Amino acid sequence: MIAKHVPMRSIKKSDFAELVKYITDEQGKTERLGHVRVTNCEANTLPAVMAEVMATQHGNTRSEADKTYHLLVSFRAGEKPDAETLRAIEDRICAGLGFAEHQRVSAVHHDTDNLHIHIAINKIHPTRNTIHEPYRAYRALADLCATLERDYGLERDNHETRQRVSENRANDMERHAGVESLVGWIKRECLPELQAAQSWEDLHRVLRENGLKLRERGNGFIFEAGDGTTVKASTVSRDLSKPKLEARFGAFTPAEGGEAPRRREYRAKPLKTRIDTTELYARYQSERQEMGAVRKGELDTLRRRRDRLIEAAMRSNRLRRAAIKLLGEGRIAKRLMYAQAHKALRADLDKINREYRQGRQAVQERTQRRAWADWLKAEAMKGDDKALAALRAREGRSDLKGNTIQGSGEAKPGHAAVTDNITKKGTIIYRVGSSAVRDDGDRLQVSREATTDGLDAALRLAMERFGDRITVNGTAEFKERIAQAAAAGRLAITFDDAALERRRQELLTKEQAHEQPERNDGRRDRGGDGGIRPAAARTTLNATGGDGDRRDARAVSAGGTVALRKPNVGRIGRKPPPQSQNRLRALSQLGVVRIAGGAEMLLPRDVPGHVEQQGAEPAHALRRGVSGPGRGLKPEQIAAAEKYVAEREQKRLNGFDIPKHARYTDYVGALSYAGTRNVEDQALALLRKENDEILVLPVDKATVQRMKRLAIGDPVTVTPRGSLKTTRGRSR
């Protein structure tokens, strides 16, 4: 776990509202924005919260410092603390920095390899209007992180605070941009030689051989590379600071003599990895130069257009003033007309400048120069396999952990339908409904709200990538859900885990037995080799199409037995329900146009008033019995539940501190009573899961009256019939 302050280089550019917009922007990605939380604010929507905080900041007119504090809390790859833990960590860190009573907005992000929280804090106290600047925040954050890791069982990180700001920035450059910094290059290439120098002459010689120069700057020394990049000597090593060097060699002596032959020199280029990125980096530099030329040309065009429009507006204003001067009106009338002309000119100039600023911003965003890692990410999103391999070869990349799926065979390239994002470490995030599947090249992971569709998509992707032999790692609950998804999807896979494979086969057998067709007399038909064939299989079904062709509606199975193409049908000869008559099931053609006689003509009086809203008649011969909660719900009950869930989810996305809501389906686990609601005269019961998610279950009014005896937080369970039951054993 790492917590760090992200300072603004320019105080004038600091803006609380813009920071909140950035951290709460989904950017068109499903797997980016998680829970958004607002603390110590009276407003209920994000725009109102931003206005409230900005008003508080404007109340302090004395301070000229940055009034916004941007805090970033990041967790190790694979760590997924629950919502309650994240809230507790945020509260304790903010309190440790002295911001417990300050206004703040936080957002959880899932679009990288590391779960992280952005926290935008107002440094102005909401009631005292005083500014608070944490003293030695880096030390306080290091101590807080160490304590929180111990209290919540998180993986330990190195919280050494001896690194300087410049060294941290160099590390960030290498980690995020993927480009070698001057500090890192000197440490890797020539630091031992510099430390072994015995005099100023030896030191200058080593520097010249490596394309560096030693210069005095202020009270210390700097190293300067051939491209003008500089770094403090003490940042590279404390042994190279000015006091240490003068204590060893005496007073500083500048370099003398001409240029010496260089063995190597620093150039900003990608960090060395296990694959060669020379061609990719050449493409990157070429596109970067082209983008710079395009940007310069478009900005020049916008600038010339703005100047022409301004000149035209000024010329029009001069003509207007000249016309006013020639008028024979009085002084007061002319003064009013001059004022109107000036006001019109100001409006025109403001419009021209506003359009110019908007156009310039659009050009800058479209032609923005990307860092090396960002360019690789963009190319990988376009389908460049070489760029994706370069991302996955970066140093510090870790494998996916937790609930994962992988294969024993060699990984083959494969892509799902929708790619939501690709991280800077080469992890592809595929969008699957409300969940997502992560792919690091070696294994797959279903992340965030692992739905049945997400598990099924992960298994199918694993089959495409690794073959039919799959290895599943994770919790027992995850393995059980994987086995259920494999059985429900009839996937032709085999699990390496013998127990899991037996469970899959058991579930598959139950699924097949459950779907075996039944006879009209209630007994199951038996079929297969050596058994009694069903009557439907012994009878030849012929259907006549529109052209008179006769088609056999039977199919021969691999074992030689006759199998119906249409499962779950009743006994042959039984008249199908009305909505199933004259359908095209298993028929090539069907004549549907005929001339009806006069006695069969449909007249207006024969058409019921609700003809456009007629529903399907029940066809119980083709249906299986429905069991479990939700059975027999009326359409208005379902509509009311869905309306309430949609309304609460929209408020949650708008920044309200509201837990996730969903309709109750077939959840099995601990639940607690969270109250009742009435929507469109329909009663809804609210049930809280262990992760604070609220499940909405429609109930009747009699059940609502009985539920009034319950208190908020009482444990309840949902019976298969859809009623509520407390731990005391009394049905509610």
From Swiss-Prot:
It holds the Pfam family TraI-like_C. It comes from the Bacteria. InterPro entries: Endonuclease_MobA/VirD2, LPD7, TraI-like_C, TraI/MobA_relaxases, TraI_M. Residues 508-528 have a biased composition (Basic and acidic residues). Keywords: Conjugation, Plasmid. Residues 508-553 are annotated as: Disordered. The keyword Transcription does not apply. The initiation process of transfer DNA synthesis requires the interaction of at least three plasmid-specific components (TraH, I, and J) at the transfer origin resulting in the assembly of a specialised nucleoprotein complex - the relaxosome. Site- and strand-specific cleavage at the transfer origin is dependent on TraI and TraJ. This is Protein TraI. It comes from Escherichia coli. The gene is traI.
